[in-house]
């Protein structure tokens, strides 16, 4: 995403954290704007042409000649773009996502951020997408549903383009939608911080982790930071196993551990 500084100011000047965001997450490019968004609420929605008469005489001109020209500073015509990698990394740090960034081919303005890993051996892909319409968001989510075999997380700036069609697609895949403006805010560092606990944000996915009494395969909740020397496994009686990891322990059957079949 890129735009003239005039447009960034117009869109985000009402946000009290905008100066901090601008200075840390926008990057100057070598390009200059030839048009900017019209600030007049006339209903036409057409851009204004940027006309340079002199270095200090730059104006945004209404092409419909409905309104007077607006004086622009040279800096306001400079094109700034999002520091996408910095934003992606900040989101991952704030939300406890294992950062493994990749651009997704064929999906515009969409990135694989990494994985949400509630416990060792179980991970959920996390995708950030920035779309400008309901239709494009539907197409992105439909493509993700077809290409991703497991439940996943879709993160978008807001719920503005979230439609019933997207909600249905995600529900069919037991997947989750997260709106950044609802769950993150910009702190003073500057860094992104969560508005609620991560276990609450990702609760629908955490609930998919099988428990010890589920009768199926379970996932041992390995404490964060546990190293291999801190893990101990003891086979008991031919059908149960006890696991210690740091200060956590548990006793499970071979079936729960996915070891009942000789193939495992």
Show where each model-derived region lies.
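Short, basic/hydrophobic alpha-helical segments
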Residues: 138-152
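Short linear interaction motifs
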Residues: 17-22, 97-114, 129-138
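Acidic, Ser/Thr-rich peripheral helices and adjacent loops at domain boundaries
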Residues: 169-187
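Intrinsically disordered, low-complexity protein-interaction/activation regions
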Residues: 1-78, 164-167, 187-264
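Active-site metal-binding core of divalent-cation-utilizing nuclease and nuclease-like domains
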Residues: 77-121
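Secondary-structure-rich domain cores
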Residues: 115-122, 141, 263-264
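Short beta-alpha junction loops
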Residues: 155-163, 182-185
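Short acidic, S/G/P-rich loop/turn micro-motifs used as interaction or catalytic elements
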Residues: 98, 117, 123-137, 146, ...
């Amino acid at each position: 995403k890129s735009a003239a500084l005039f447009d960034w100011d117009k869109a985000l000047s009402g946000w009290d954290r905008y100066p901090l965001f601008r200075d840390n997450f926008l990057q100057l490019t070598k390009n200059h704007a030839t048009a900017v968004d019209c600030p007049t609420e006339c209903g036409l929605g057409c851009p204004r042409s940027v006309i340079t008469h002199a270095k200090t005489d730059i104006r945004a001109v209404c092409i419909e000649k409905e309104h007077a020209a607006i004086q622009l500073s040279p800096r306001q015509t400079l094109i700034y773009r999002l520091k996408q990698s910095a934003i992606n990394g900040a989101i991952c740090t704030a939300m406890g996502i294992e950062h493994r960034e990749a651009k997704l081919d064929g999906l515009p303005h969409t990135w694989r951020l990494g994985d949400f890993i509630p416990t060792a051996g179980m991970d959920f892909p996390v995708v950030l997408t920035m779309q400008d319409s309901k239709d494009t968001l539907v197409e992105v989510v439909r493509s993700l549903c077809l290409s991703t075999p497991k439940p996943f997380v879709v993160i978008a700036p807001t719920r503005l383009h979230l439609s019933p069609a997207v909600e249905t697609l995600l529900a069919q895949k037991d997947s989750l939608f997260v709106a950044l403006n609802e769950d993150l805010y910009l702190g003073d560092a500057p860094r992104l911080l969560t508005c609620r606990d991560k276990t609450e944000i990702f609760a629908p996915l955490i609930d998919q982790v099988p428990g010890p009494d589920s009768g199926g395969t379970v996932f041992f909740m390995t404490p964060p930071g546990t190293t291999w020397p801190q893990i101990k496994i003891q086979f008991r009686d031919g059908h149960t196993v006890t696991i210690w990891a740091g200060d956590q322990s548990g006793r499970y059957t071979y079936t729960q551990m996915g070891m009942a079949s000789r193939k495992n």
